Amino acid sequence: MDCRPMNEEGRKILDRLRRLCSRREYCRKDVMKKALDALDGDAAAAQEVVDVLVDEKYVDDLRYASAYARDKAGLSGWGEVKIRHMLAAKGVAREIISEALGQIDSSKAQLRLEKLIENKYRSLKDDPQCRLKLLRFALGRGYGYDEVARVVDFLMKYD
């Protein structure tokens, strides 16, 4: 499958990275870092290894971003803002991030936010800065200010 000239060390590293990428998703930037580390900083050889992995579909930023967004939203309870920021830090393109975030069920995310704030509210009920602390907590989880403020205000008004 690989018709490019590559030395023995490059082929070994390529095989190792194929095994890694077949076990879980990696973004292009993470694979490039692993290749650079293994090749002692040889950027040209590392780029060649990454290009082969992308051509062979071992590395796909959209697939990585979709899995990352799904896991962080579903398992970690992160909001769209935090997921977007973390994927951008991984070097994933904006269009790919938007497409991956579009796959998240917004109604489930809203329910998760409500439950998250409701649970935190129970521990802060008597605190004079309850609203501020709830806002800060939910914003830190990566939810947008408007949706957080709406849920917090509703909860405090009807409690």
Predicted regions and their residues:
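An alpha-helical, amphipathic repeat domain used for nucleic-acid recognition
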Residues: 1-159
